[in-house]
Amino acid sequence: MTTFLQAILFLLASGTVGQSYLTAAAAQSGASSHLDAMKSLYRREPPLPVTNQPLVDLGRDLFFDPLISASGTTACVSCHLPQLGWAVTDPKSRNDSGKLTSRRSQPLTGIGHAGKAPLGWDGRNPTLEAQAKASIATGSMSMSATPTPVKVEIIEERVRANAAYVAKFKAALPDAPINIDTIVLAIAVFERTLEPAVAPFDRWIEGDQAAISESAKRGFELYNGKALCFTCHRGWRFTDDLFHDIGTTSTDRGRGAVVKDDPSMQFAFKTPTLRDVALRPPYMHHGQQATLDEVMRHYEKGGIDRPSRSPLMQPIVLTNEERQDLIAFMETLSGGSGAAVPKR
């Protein structure tokens, strides 16, 4: 259990979670008020530095190219659209064969800032390179119960036979061969540049008081107080990059299928970013909730009571106005179709 989680559980027990957390934040940031303290916790980090622009450009081309799938019809972008925060609105993704997988795709926006956190709903991939390789090698986006192995040599030969790619690999990695490892390296390097577009919330954080509505401002205070949303969806990316069982109806064991000796990880899934969240319903790993209103009501009830359910899942009572204020706030996290796509 992380130190942060231990602290939050203590504050939950004392009934002072929102106030105590923000008092500590104010002391650390030097903020003059609780509101300023809250805002300081969500200020964007600068984009990650690019040290090899030709490699980023190569990765972008590969990300958008169905050439690297077995069928020749599916690309990374098929499940990660830039205008939707690098995700899709399908309740469940389809694999390269067109069959439904067991989960929906996770957004990639801001993924480069996840550091060393395990990736995917169940955290089975330690790096973006590993995730891309698994997607290509199984043709399943790593979400199918019955993946079909793909001969990566076929993909490698296709890329080597493409004169444009040969030239781009030479420019980006002059001394490296063209193989599955350098292909996924380029894709991963590109994915680390996928910064969220500037949203109304960001403009408000930086001082534009008119950027968001009064309802959204009230929602922000609820988010960091009574509603307890910040306990998992915190920081400027609105995720703790951890795994929690939030009590959804599902037979999918999530992280528990990967870390089988940890009872607390049964039915636990990665906390997704809330950046661009209003653009990509439905919600949860299976698309169980159709709207943000349904999501709010799930958290109000506290989810299914079972041994693995996160202790952070505490029933709460929200008025209709408070629920709408929270939704208004989350709608300010969308940057729209201006999602930052690196130039080719």
What are these regions (language model features)?
Residues 1-8:
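Bacterial N-terminal signal peptides that target proteins for export
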Residues 11-18:
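Hydrophobic h-region of N-terminal signal peptides that target proteins for export
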Residues 6, 21-344:
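Periplasmic c-type cytochrome electron-transfer domains
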